[in-house]
Amino acid sequence: LKRLYELRDYARHNIDTVVSVGIGGSYLGSKVIFDVQCGAFWNNLSTEERNGYPRMYFAGFNVDGDYLAGLIRTLEYQAQKKGPDYKVMLVITSKSGSTIEPMANFMILEKALQDRNINYEVVAVTDVSDDEHPTILRAMALENNWKTYSIPYGVGGRFSVFTEVGFVTAALVGFDIEGFLAGAASM
């Protein structure tokens, strides 16, 4: 949990907007945590009203070009409004490290941020693999020195919310991870 709390504290002071990119269990669990913790209008609240936590959007759960274009316009607007200090965190989650929808959405988002000179950093959440035979996503993370979190071997998508797949989102919006785990353990 220490690394997750460090991520939480870092994001509260350095990140304006998080875009969580995933599909299936890599999306749904995080989206439920966000909805439970934040509600529908979180992104409309001021930084103070969000207790310093960043805005959060989701992408990669489909191949809808209009949705992605709208998200990019939103990020561009926010960057123009805040100025050069605006910073985005892309959280790309893929168990296999190569799922088409999130990887394609991630590449489009990254290119859009680069083209618009918007500051960003990347966090990768992917299957545990050794550095000798990494998933495509883990190889990208190693090459680019991104923060990484792991999906344990054998954990299916619907249960991944109880791993760093869900916990990264939870940390980034101030969700009580320890309480969540205690509740799950009591069932």
Roles of regions detected by a PLM:
Residues 9-187:
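Glycine-rich phosphate-binding loops that contact phosphosugars or nucleotide phosphates
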